Curated annotation (Swiss-Prot):
Pfam families with a match to the protein in the record: EGF_2, EGF_Teneurin
Cytoplasmic side, ranges: 549-591, 700-722, 774-801, 859-868, 919-952
Name the record gives this protein: Substrate-adhesion molecule
Gene field: sadA
PROSITE patterns per the UniProt record, alphabetical: EGF_1, EGF_3
Extracellular membrane side: 26-527, 613-678, 744-752, 823-837, 890-897
Superkingdom in the source lineage: Eukaryota
Record: glycosylation sites: N78, N182, N231, N243, N412, N456
Annotated Gene Ontology cellular component terms: plasma membrane
Domain EGF-like positions: 438-471
Taxonomic lineage of the native organism: Eukaryota, Amoebozoa, Evosea, Eumycetozoa, Dictyostelia
Disulphide-bonded residues: C442-C452, C446-C459, C461-C470
Reported function: Involved in substrate adhesion, myosin-independent cytokinesis, organization of actin cytoskeleton, and phagocytosis.
Amino acid sequence: MKSQKIGSMILLIGILLAIFNFAYSDDDIERFSINPEKPISFTSDQPGFPTSADFPIGSILANSFYSFGGDVNYFQLNISLMEEFSKDGNTGSQATWNQYTSVPVSPISSAVTANRVYTMSIGSLNRVKKGDITSMESTDFLNDEKYSSLVTTLNGGVSYGDDVFFLSSKSATGEAVLIHINDTATGTFGTSSYDEILLDAAINDPSSITVDSKLGLAFIGDSDGDILVFNMTLKAKIAIYSNSSIANLRSSGVVDEERQLLYICGQAGGMNSYITQVDIFHYSATDITLLHSFTILGSLCPSAGIDVKGGQLFFSTTTSSGSQLIGTDTSGGNTGSLSENIANTQSVAISVDSITKTISVFYPDSVFYGTFKSICPSDCSGHGECNYGTCVCDHNYQGQGCEEELCLTLNNCTGTDNGKCENGFCYCSSEWEGAQCEIRRCKDSCNGYGTCNTANYTCVCDSAHMGETCNELVPPPPCTYYTDSESCLSRTTCGWCEVDGLCKEGDRYGPFEGFCRTWFFDTNVETGVIALACIFIAFVGILYIIDIGTTVPIDIKRAKDYAEENKSGQFPKATHEEASVLWWRDQRSHKAWTFMDQFQLISLVSHIGVVFPSRFISFTEYLDWSNLGIPLPPSINPPQIWSVPTDWTSNTARTILSMAQYENSLGSGDLYLLPNILFWFGLLLGVFLVPLLLAYAIISFMESLIHWKEVVTNRLIHVLVRILTFGYIGVLIAASFAMVTPLHDYRIIIPGAIIFVLYGIGLPIAIWFLLAVPEARLHNPTFKQRFGCLYVHYKPKTDHRFVVFMFIKRFIMAVIIGILSFKPMTNYPLTGTDLAVPIVQVVVIDIALIGYAVLLFIRKPYFDHYQLWLEYLLTAINIVTVSLSLTHIKSPSAAGELIACLIQALALVACIAAYVVAWLQMRSSFIKKVKKYLCCCCKSSKSSGEIDLSKK
């Protein structure tokens, strides 16, 4: 019972494997061994095919197929000529088909010896000599009691030398019997010409017989799936194999005599099943052993063939849709099926030619002929033989498909260490050369940068190279090796410190170690940058001189007015022209400060955490506007030294500059940024306020100049408001950065927080409440002189506090730059925090600018419409400039920098143009004289032109 369960499980697994195998092989015919491009089928309705041919049985011997047809005609087919006749489809040549004679009764089985063809029919045994149609002999054993009850097995005839065997069984008991005839026996052919050999009782109803002609063994299968091994020389049994997984008859089999392997079919799952199991046995003269089993699709496996060289099996089976030819390798793999041009009846025999790779399948009324592919890679490329799926290459080839030609004629590349043979050519190693890799050389021939010392085959490199093969550059000497600026600046990582007269490692911002005030990098003189700095300083200087120069007469006039007020008790009322001049002067002054504000925005944009050229920040070696947004000297001497690792191969001609990077460029630690900014802010306050304070102190002791005291007081407050407004962005950025510095040191966080609250938040709030006064107060001369710079350019009744919104815009931009300052590396493209920070900064700044522009459009706060349109233009340009920062995220963008520079140049030109327009609008006697002079010149030129025309 247990063995039956095991057998059933094995059968079930085999069925599933067969279904899976064919589910994939039917659609992939290229995997099948049969070549589908050349299948030819010859049928009885084709020209030349024997009209009476009908092959229910047949035998193959010496490349010929012998068969007796249903009309008892005997035919012989020369298989070797099938290729020639497959070309034109004509099989009618007598060299191919030979009809010899007729037999009295339709045969059931046949066998062929060297001299005769034997057939066995119901009740008779027949033989005929090859080529002699008159030699038919028959014997009738129906009346012979000994043989009358025999049932002959279909296609159960075989031959071994001169012995012929027909497989039969007794009708009553099913016992297996072999009818034996010796072809060389003399005498009359009759009942005495053959004898009966009873087989083992375990074999019932024999169904197939397969012969190994080399060892003289016959493998007899029965209807129960058992196999008897029979020695045809000794006429004796050797062994019996019983397989519990096969419970139905054994059909055809085929043997590989060289390897002593038997491949035999067995019906799996019952007679009506379409699954056939193929068992693989290894046998000897004394034993038989099961090695492996696999399943194929189909039933009634009547014939099989084998390619004994390549290792392919062919089976003819039947399915519900008709007959098919199945090909596999000897393990059951690489399976495929072919049904095209296949007859719908059971096959009689299969002939396989391993040399020509052709296969012939014989059916009762047709012959299938085709070629099959080799299962060896590339059919061994024509340079070897396929041996059971493995190439046995010729002596001068190697590889799985014998595709690689050995270098036997090249002395095999003079050894495995000298080179490698590839397809008949030697590819030498780096230390050998020549057709056979027989010539020694230096490794890689020193890469062309040295000579070979043949004493020990080592490279002697030139002065610029080093290494075993001279493939490495000699590292440059340290920067300190260079003693003049020209040679120093020729190195990409060296800079020249003019003060010390030393060459040091660094970048555009200064040396990596220490500090240098006069630092040159890349070139000694940056002409374009210095020219830009000179233009900026010239413009700022001119505007400052104009502002100061026009202030002195106004202050003198106001001092007289204060003196008059002290005498009469009433401040003198200004004339219409004086009021107009003062109003337009205020508008002109505001446009000058707008010009300065635009420069500050460029500085602020330069602190966004993306790559900008260093010259965009450092005007010259002497000026840097990262301090307060104006060109000031880079820094004071630092209190400590800061250093970074050096890299001979780095080139920092382009450098990231956030506030953190700027702090690094100062040559100090995180504690130094805020004090440095405050130093310049304090210095700026001192430069302007100290002289005024001294003047105030002196005037206080002079009774005759007491009316000047009010003027100086007003000017002190006015200058203080201007400086607080100007320094707002720079100081607030530094304070914001100080609060988030990685040091988390109270010495920098607390001062930063105090400045942030008092200056960053407190100043706009103080201005809001300061300007919350009646309109009459706004026109008061004293109040106006002190705080007029905050509101005189706005509409006094409705928008005089609009300046607070300007401070809110500056507050947002400064804080987002300061708190998001970080120390990124110059790696592209930017990722992670390096990518997020500039995006956030740009988005927030753009939102602040857009919000400010919306307020401008809604309120239209300016009296001067030129100023309003200037603000519109500058806001649009600044939004674009800030957004262009993002063009540097993936890589430094020259186009982004160029566009930013061009539109900022346009913005500065617009500021200057608005300044000139405001000046021309002043209704003063001086301006009138200038206009009158210009008009006279124009009239004179026009008159001269008219005279010239008349003369012509």
